[in-house]
Regions:
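Extracellular, disulfide-bonded carbohydrate-recognition/adhesion ectodomains
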Residues: 1-143
């Protein structure tokens, strides 16, 4: 996040080039792919973190931004939700995980060993398009 953009009580008033603004936050959708740990480190290096989704409006906005992304058509974007312990989900900023404010695809989250990271999937019906996956190479959303 650029220091030349003033932060007010309503959040950021502008966003760095290549970032998208929504309700006082700035978001970066990557076109390159990294594993989850590298993705979080990349976001941190830009003064942000993997996105923490706090509302249905934010979830729908991000899903629409993914669908509008042109060539190459990226499918899966990491968010800042991960398994801390088996069956226990944790946001990167320690926001409490709330199952009623989660947007899982039908049949998700699956109880599969090693599927400890969460992505938003491009082609799933809105707003429920989260999927837990192995923490391999995917795109990312920084906030």
């Amino acid at each position: 996040i650029s220091l030349s953009c003033p932060c007010t009580d309503r959040g950021w008033t502008c966003c760095p080039k290549g970032w998208r603004r929504f309700q006082g936050s700035c978001y970066f959708l990557s076109l390159d792919r990294m594993n989850w740990t590298e993705s979080e480190q990349n976001c941190t290096g830009m003064g942000s973190q993997l996105v923490v989704i706090n509302s249905k409006a934010e979830q729908v906005f991000l899903s629409e931004q993914i669908r509008q992304t042109k060539e190459p058509k990226p499918d899966n974007f990491y968010i800042g939700l991960f398994v801390e312990k088996v069956g226990q989900w944790q946001w990167v900023d320690k926001t409490p995980y709330n199952v009623t404010a989660a947007f899982w695809r039908k049949g998700e989250p699956s109880v599969v060993p090693d599927e400890n990271c969460v992505i938003i999937h491009r082609d799933t019906e809105l707003p429920n398009n989260w999927n837990n996956v192995r923490c391999l190479l995917h795109h990312r959303i920084c906030e």
